[in-house]
């Protein structure tokens, strides 16, 4: 189990900056970034410190309160895609999967809709438009999630992607928690959650 230290806000900020800088280096080497967990009493500025450093680094700051959302909020909305081809069956055939929203546009450009379709998922609204620079994703109340949400979060933490979308290169995930030894309604973390190995 990971060792827990008590730090003040400035120390937390410096530690976060170290992890963020390290994650940029890891991403540059094609390695997965490391998530960091901050545990503290409510009102001790855990989320504020993360937002402050995100603003200083000009990262997109996204905060998800995990006790208030469901797994579908991580997945995104279902969309229907259709397979279309230009010059079908010829050497220069070009085929794409497009959503029903742009199908007419591609047909007008000379593509033919085939009789193939599939269900896909759009990016969740909270990540759309944030592909241009790294994201500092704060998962608040990490130890207050349901088991299903905990599994979804572990995938996101391990892979920096979930189902149909991924975080931009160089992004960092920060988890915030309330202490499990206090009078809060929290879930005990298992060893995989505590160490992120």
Where are these regions (language model features)?
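AAA+ P-loop NTPase catalytic core and its hallmark functional loops
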Residues: 2-197
């Amino acid at each position: 189990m990971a060792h827990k230290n008590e730090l003040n806000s400035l120390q937390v900020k410096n530690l976060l900056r170290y992890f963020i800088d390290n994650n940029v280096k890891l991403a540059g080497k094609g390695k997965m970034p490391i998530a960091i967990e901050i545990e503290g009493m409510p009102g001790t500025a855990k989320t504020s410190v993360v937002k402050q450093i995100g603003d200083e680094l000009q990262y997109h700051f996204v905060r998800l309160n995990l006790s208030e959302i469901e797994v579908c909020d991580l997945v995104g909305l279902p969309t229907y895609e259709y397979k279309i081809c230009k010059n079908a069956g010829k050497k220069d055939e070009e085929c794409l999967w497009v959503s029903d929203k742009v199908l007419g546009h591609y047909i007008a450009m000379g593509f033919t809709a085939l009789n193939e379709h599939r269900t896909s998922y759009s990016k969740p609204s909270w990540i759309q438009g944030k592909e241009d620079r790294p994201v500092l994703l704060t998962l608040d109340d990490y130890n207050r999630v349901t088991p299903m949400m905990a599994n979804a979060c572990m995938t996101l933490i391990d892979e920096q992607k979930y189902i149909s979308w991924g975080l931009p290169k160089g992004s960092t995930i920060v988890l915030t928690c309330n202490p499990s030894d206090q009078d809060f309604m929290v879930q005990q973390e298992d060893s995989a959650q505590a160490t992120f190995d």
